[in-house]
Amino acid sequence: MARSSSSRDISFDTDFGSAHIRWDGPRATLFLGDVESSAVDTSDPTYLEFEYMQHMDAVVSSLWGAQDRFRALHVGGAACALACAWSSSHSQSRHVAVEVDRLLAEQVREHFPIPKAPQVKIRVGDGRAVLDGTREGSFDVIVRDAFASGVTPDHLRTVECVQRARATLTARGLYLVNCAHGGAANARQDVAALREVFPFVASIQDPKVGRGGRRGNVVALACADGVVDVDEIDRALRTLALPARITRPRDLERWVAGTPALRDAQVGYPQADE
């Protein structure tokens, strides 16, 4: 049930809690509970407010030009900010956003200017189940950006999940992973899982976040050898409003420092009734 809090702001119930859309001029921010989840500028669909999305955009833009076609699977939908931005900046791209919360997906489709399918298709379902059931080689990009109460569900972080992601990608496909780090969240586990499956793994992270000095986002990118130009990505990252740097594979290996990867059996996936 939707509950308006002002002429433009709106609050509503979801399958897993509550959500709020707050407007500031042309910009709308989606909150899930008290956590900012997505931000969209209705006057500029390419606008990306969150730094980690800018980092992912720099990687994708290094591989595909404005007129190039690619297919992207977004595991974690919310307001589909990244899918919408890429749909605008790369007009031939096609996107499937997987959102586990049906009511949230319905409200987002109603209140945000999300392009219709086939440009952006919203699929309701569990991200891992969708990965497990997707035909091999179906996507050029997979973005994992799924959170519940501020943490990524463990069944999306295991070696087996990464194996499914790699199988779902084309041979030169790219897996982009938004990892929380700090406090109880340990992005080293995510990176360790990626390193067991992909030949090339790098990351983009604030040094303070990497040291555990504050909670934040680590963007990991994984692919086959020779797919990405690390120097080109690094140059693009340094031009951002808040410049960033890429952590190269050898430095990332030291950062992980023997952290073990999670496995399905450890996290109880699949559950007995699945």
Locations of regions flagged by a protein language model:
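Generic structural signal for well-ordered, non-membrane alpha-helical segments
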Residues: E49, A187, R245-R248
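C-terminal substrate-binding/active-site "lid" region of AdoMet-derived donor-dependent transferases
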Residues: V159-D229
